[in-house]
């Protein structure tokens, strides 16, 4: 069921989405996003850039699934205790949604690092995430840069020296991609993405695509996780699309 709400001339609607049932729909970017921006003309685009891609996701775990607590920057426990694999995956991805027995969730985000109470993840990941600390997130899927929240299938983590936060990119190979959500909703992607996050391993022409609670991305076959397997993207200049995607990545 779709309840369209017109605010000015915003393209976004409220869409029922079971994967985020614990959040008010007004605060859930995926529920608001119709993925219905028009195909761009040459007047809507500027520079073409060559990129290579990986993806990241939001782990969704039980609140008492292990013995490793999430801790804040003051080294205080935040409540959830995860398995080693779950803790390390959460640290690597930068956020985690903790589900309680009623199916309600709370999202925690990367807060920084401190040397106290490290968790040894070196058997799981080559990148050292052992000192990661967390905080409660503002957005239901986690937070990005500059007070942006993450929006599934829209947010890109970029090297901000190459792609400035707030930039909108159009990826032709993404247009028309079909994404089936747990709720049964089928998204037909319009090809537009928003630079709203960063990552320690994201350098130069490497972008990381946020795919929500999915753990893989067969719907985006252009993501090869190989720096030699590139694709083309275009910087978008359409002010309305930029404004709408900025709004989508902002809490209110």
Question: Where do the PLM segments sit?
Answer:
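Bacterial N-terminal signal peptides
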Residues: 6-13
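Solvent-exposed, well-ordered loop and adjacent helix/strand elements within mature globular domains
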Residues: 18-252
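Bacterial N-terminal signal peptides that target proteins for export
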Residues: 1-5
